[in-house]
């Protein structure tokens, strides 16, 4: 054996003979023949040089992988149906890319073979958010939905790290001819080329939404306009490279357009709005113009050509003056207008708003917010002119006082059903009474939210003026006392929201429940710290159909919860006791008793309720959504 290992240098080899003294043991490690050459470097461990031995274990390439992509493409497009193509697509990314790149017109299927799924064409919808939005997923969706009715609705919400590009939209465009709705949010990696693919392959597209798509220009929108004549809804927001040219193409080619919303697109000017309105006079029903660089000209066009508009939203139009609203109202084109929303437009003055009221005789709903130049005179004039008005909401109109509020109530006619005041800081308490014959019998809903000057005298006047109220919302009115609330006790109240009214007492709740026990369905007294268990006892005794009760941050305890559970009449579906520190684990049996009808339970910030109790309720009340 010593001769075997007595090598002088790198060129020494041992030929012929077994490496190990026992060939049977050696065969367990290496199948070396008696003629294998072995080289032993002097300073390294021995290694075997036998390339021909291990070649038998190498993975041989599959024969079909030898084919170039062109040949595979020809094979895939001749498969008999979408299921077969889908099965092939999920073999590898290479095959998926090839299958998803096949246009519908390139599919070569014998005429005797028909594909199923025509009855529910375009019935599927898919949504990709954030990191899930990738080209591979889009390709898989395109191929996978082809054999199951076809993709009808696609929404892509990207992120800064999104890996979706034109390649993904190419897959959709070539494989989903039934696509009817496409929504793209925050996808800066998609360009006009992606929309060109959609335009070429998805001629049935009806709804298009582009939000923060900074790389899409007029070119992409023009392509959509030319190839998708059935487009009915268009939404553009924060698309910095889309302007008048794209809107002009849409107006000329999409005669069925019914809804347009454009927000924060700096290149959209009067010319684009004018072309849009003048070419869709008979079809356009909903129009939203927000934060645009348009002037009085656009509003004049709206007033003249908006013959079919029923819903109009104007927001943040800083370059529109009083003249614009005056001309819009006098254009007599908005005869069908049903709903009007105006927000943060400096041109809303008394004269402008009165003109709009006169020019829209069929308007039923109006929302006016953030209009610092609107005063009592303008509001009352608008109310007189709007003979069909059923709902009026004012928000952050700080020049409107209590005189404008009551004046509009008295002059809105017999159709006004809902009135809302939100954050109007000039509202104060009445110091003079209203005429004895005054009434507003049609009003059913009144909402006064966060108007700190609104007090008891106003509520007393409302109690006399509006005897048929059903829905009362007095959120955040800390200046109202017990006597003020008692003026509003009607016999038909259905929904009550007194959240944040710190002066609300048990006496008021007892009086309300005793008078409205057979009609009250919703009661919200969140944050009314003077409410105790006595109110819950009254609720349990009087309320027959109450379904939603919010007693968060009230001074209630376990006794109050037990009182609710003891009522045979009460069938609560929603109960909130968030922030009630005196409600403890002792209320567990009572809550379980209420749980037979509960669908929602809020136990957040109930520090005296242990986690084990919450876990038990989650397990026991399996039909109820529990927040803790």
From Swiss-Prot:
Q: In which compartments does the protein localize? A: Nucleus
> What does the subunit section of this Swiss-Prot or TrEMBL entry state?
Part of a SCF (SKP1-cullin-F-box) protein ligase complex. Interacts with CUL1, SKP1A/ASK1, SKP1B/ASK2, ASK11, ASK12, ASK13, ASK18, EIN3, and EIL1.
What is the organism field in this record?
Arabidopsis thaliana (Mouse-ear cress)
The GO annotation for biological process reads: ethylene-activated signaling pathway; negative regulation of ethylene-activated signaling pathway; protein ubiquitination; response to ethylene; ubiquitin-dependent protein catabolic process
Q: Which tissues is it found in, per the record?
A: Ubiquitous.
Q: What is the protein's known function? A: Component of SCF(EBF1) E3 ubiquitin ligase complexes, which may mediate the ubiquitination and subsequent proteasomal degradation of target proteins (probably including EIN3 and EIL1). Regulator of the ethylene signaling cascade by modulating the stability of EIN3 and EIL1 proteins. Confers insensitivity to ethylene.
* Gene3D superfamilies associated with the record: 1.20.1280.50, Ribonuclease Inhibitor
Q: Which residues form the F-box domain?
A: 61-109
- InterPro entries named among the record's database cross-references: F-box-like_dom_sf (IPR036047), F-box_dom (IPR001810), Leu-rich_rpt (IPR001611), Leu-rich_rpt_Cys-con_subtyp (IPR006553), LRR_dom_sf (IPR032675)
Q: Which GO terms describe its cellular component?
A: cytoplasm; nucleus
Q: Which CDD domains match?
A: F-box_AtTIR1-like
Q: What name has this protein been given in UniProt?
A: EIN3-binding F-box protein 1
Expression is induced as follows: EIN3-dependent induction by ethylene.
**Domain of life of the native organism:** Eukaryota
Q: In which pathway does it act?
A: Protein modification; protein ubiquitination
What is written about domains in the entry's comments?
The F-box is necessary for the interaction with ASK proteins.
What's in the keyword line of the UniProt record? Ethylene signaling pathway, Nucleus, Ubl conjugation pathway
Q: Which SMART domains match?
A: FBOX, LRR_CC
